[in-house]
Amino acid sequence: MENYQGQHGYGADRVDVYGNPVGAGQYGGGATAPGGGHGAMGMGGHAGAGAGGQFQPAREDRKTGGILHRSGSSSSSSSSEDDGMGGRRKKGIKEKIKEKLPGGNKGNNQQQQQMMGNTGGAYGQQGHAGMTGAGTGVHGAEYGNAGEKKGFMDKIKEKLPGQH
């Protein structure tokens, strides 16, 4: 029986044009087509429509030879950024989206990262180098009426308990 495998009418492993296994009960090689007609299928051919069957035209397979063709468009944002320690790290989806939003990225993120890397401060702390006087400096996120808008982090810090 082994010498008859691969020939028409014998139990060979059959695959469709995409390499998926095809059982004996599926369309092709002698099974009844949905319209009642019989499709004739030879080696490497396409099944035609029988009397009353549905006809599907042969598709040409387009192969690129293993080369990935890319479109000409590119994104202006890179997938990695400086981590402040001399290395690089991957950006998350949120960071990529924030970069693309208009007016949302004014360099605050890079300035904050540079300050963290240079001063060695903890995350979220801002440098208060000259404010050692007892009660005479600006305290925390309370800026007074200097005409400066509060930043996003300052608004969050205000709402946290025990940070005053």
Curated annotation (Swiss-Prot):
Entry keyword Signal: no
Coiled coil: none
A Pfam family per the record: Dehydrin
One GO cellular component term noted in the UniProt record for this chain: cytosol
GO process annotations (BP): cold acclimation; response to abscisic acid; response to water deprivation
Induction of the gene: By abscisic acid (ABA) and water stress.
Keyword annotations from UniProtKB, A to Z: Stress response
Disordered: annotated segments: 1-164
Keyword Transmembrane helix assigned: no
Biased composition (Basic and acidic residues): 147-164
Listed Gly residues bias regions: 25-53
Biased composition (Low complexity): 107-117
Signal sequence, renumbered to the chain: none
InterPro entries assigned: Dehydrin, Dehydrin_CS
Family as reported in the entry's similarity comment: Belongs to the plant dehydrin family.
Protein name: Dehydrin Rab16B
Organism: Oryza sativa subsp. indica (Rice)
Gene: RAB16B
